[in-house]
UniProtKB/Swiss-Prot annotation:
It comes from Dendrothele bispora (strain CBS 962.96). Keywords: Methylation, Methyltransferase, S-adenosyl-L-methionine, Transferase, Virulence. GO terms for biological process: methylation. The modification N-methylisoleucine is found at residues 406, 410. The keyword Methyltransferase applies. Homodimer. InterPro entries: 4pyrrol_Mease, 4pyrrol_Methylase_sf, 4pyrrole_Mease_sub1. S-adenosyl-L-methionine binds at residues 98, 100, 103, 130, 172, 213, 244-245. Residues 1-251 are annotated as: Methyltransferase domain. Fusion protein of the methyltransferase dbiM and the dendrothelin core peptide; part of the gene cluster that mediates the biosynthesis of dendrothelin A, a highly methylated cyclic dodecapeptide showing slight nematodicidal activity. Dendrothelin A derives from the C-terminus of the dbiMA protein, and it is the dbiMA protein that methylates its own C-terminus using S-adenosyl methionine (SAM). The C-terminus is subsequently cleaved off and macrocyclized by the prolyloligopeptidase dbiP to give the final product. This is Methyltransferase/ribosomally synthesized cyclic peptide dendrothelin A precursor dbihMA. CDD domains: OphMA_like.
Amino acid sequence: MESSTQTKPGSLIVVGTGIESIGQMTLQALSYIEAASKVFYCVIDPATEAFILTKNKNCVDLYQYYDNGKSRMDTYTQMAELMLKEVRNGLDVVGVFYGHPGVFVNPSHRALAIARSEGYQARMLPGVSAEDCLFADLCIDPSNPGCLTYEASDFLIRERPVNVHSHLILFQVGCVGIADFNFSGFDNSKFTILVDRLEQEYGPDHTVVHYIAAMMPHQDPVTDKFTIGQLREPEIAKRVGGVSTFYIPPKARKDINTDIIRLLEFLPAGKVPDKHTQIYPPNQWEPDVPTLPPYGQNEQAAITRLEAHAPPEEYQPLATSKAMTDVMTKLALDPKALAEYKADHRAFAQSVPDLTPQERAALELGDSWAIRCAMKNMPSSLLEAASQSVEEASMNGFPWVIVTGIVGVIGSVVSSA
């Protein structure tokens, strides 16, 4: 469906629908669902299922392969094989899974690996995962101060390490030690083993957030705050189900290494770094975080400078034609058009009417920087840098590209393989 180098008929594209019904499905995922020869889906809400069925009439619901007491791994093997069978029959297959199709999803990875090993085109497209929803709903940044993510049973079985100075996210906390499936939910009888481990690492008084992402647009997420010790209470423990996730905030901030700060030259000469990294805004779930004020001296000065702001010389405002906007949109959302373009950049670019000469040259080349130059009002200083970068790339074995002249946005671009 996408590559001109494919020699065997049949392909597999795996996409995600996000967690919240319909609205978190990407435009890219939707375009592949619409273009597929056959769609296999496993989603958790009927509105998303109904929406998928309006976009492609040749669909199979994979959820029917779950059963009470049946091994989930057996189900996953069957799901993968159902998709692979149609790929081997020469169809362009799309597998649709809720959330991100590669995050806590086994059959997608299995099917892709086997398809690739057999010589078929296979690709996974990103989607909105439950973890993405958690970051948004709890307003935490995984980069500050770092984040560990584990599956709860694996966390216990393999004694995965904990860094009490970073975020910890545990998935599938409502089915600890359970390998089969039950339509009525899981008997989470081994849950206290997980609580024991968390108490060992953090103590009974540390915060844990019981999180469930909203699955319908009219719902709010569950963000219940408890102590780890409270998880032993039956009334609280029974709230934890198959779609529950735990977020455990850092226990304390780690001291910075002042020697490394100096080596990296992060601070002006003579300035002494604080013992702790101060932040704003603070993490509402984290205790005792050294926090900066929202409007300190530096912030107030930066806001004052807005009054005299003028775009810098190297700022790049958009300056593109409707034809270029339309064709780039088509390449993003039409898998068949994308396949045609990848097969022959030059022929495809020549078939598009109303492009400027610069836009057509950039489209023929297919280089992201050249396309950016054509669509933006690119300053000459950046164009010269682009020219130098292209020249260096050609020396390293990339296709030979010569920027022969700079006229307007970009000059004529000559490319030969």
